[in-house]
């Protein structure tokens, strides 16, 4: 797994909407983005790791669905998280 507990807690603290918030859309997108970055680096060195490539595609699709939900519900939060994480769409 790419994220240890300290890194995960740091991301949750940064993007949480409240004190005990661990599951808001922003937090989920931020955690998925970190996992996607890790897998992207992994696949640069391990080009034949096809199972990780499929896992990466699954994570990207999940993040895309969450971003679409956020865009439909709160456009301002969508712009904020998109700019903060450097996501294109």
From Swiss-Prot:
Top-level division of the source organism's lineage: Bacteria
An individual GO BP term: translation
Keywords: Ribonucleoprotein, Ribosomal protein, RNA-binding, rRNA-binding
GO cellular component, one term: cytosolic small ribosomal subunit
One Gene Ontology term of the molecular function aspect: structural constituent of ribosome
Gene3D superfamilies reported for this sequence: 6.10.250.3130, S15/NS1, RNA-binding
Pfam families linked: Ribosomal_S15
InterPro entries: Ribosomal_uS15, Ribosomal_uS15_bac-type, uS15_NS1_RNA-bd_sf
Family: Belongs to the universal ribosomal protein uS15 family.
Subunit structure: Part of the 30S ribosomal subunit. Forms a bridge to the 50S subunit in the 70S ribosome, contacting the 23S rRNA.
Primary role: One of the primary rRNA binding proteins, it binds directly to 16S rRNA where it helps nucleate assembly of the platform of the 30S subunit by binding and bridging several RNA helices of the 16S rRNA. Forms an intersubunit bridge (bridge B4) with the 23S rRNA of the 50S subunit in the ribosome.
Record protein name field: Small ribosomal subunit protein uS15
Native source organism of the sequence: Sulfurovum sp. (strain NBC37-1)
């Amino acid at each position: 797994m790419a994220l240890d507990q300290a890194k995960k807690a740091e991301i949750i603290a940064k993007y949480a909407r409240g004190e005990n918030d661990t599951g808001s859309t922003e937090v989920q997108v931020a955690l998925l983005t970190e996992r996607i970055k890790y897998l992207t680096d992994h696949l640069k060195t391990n080009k034949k790791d096809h199972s990780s490539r499929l896992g990466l595609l699954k994570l990207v699709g999940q993040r895309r669905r969450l971003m679409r939900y956020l865009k439909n519900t709160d456009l301002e939060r969508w712009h904020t998280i998109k700019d903060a994480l450097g996501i294109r769409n």
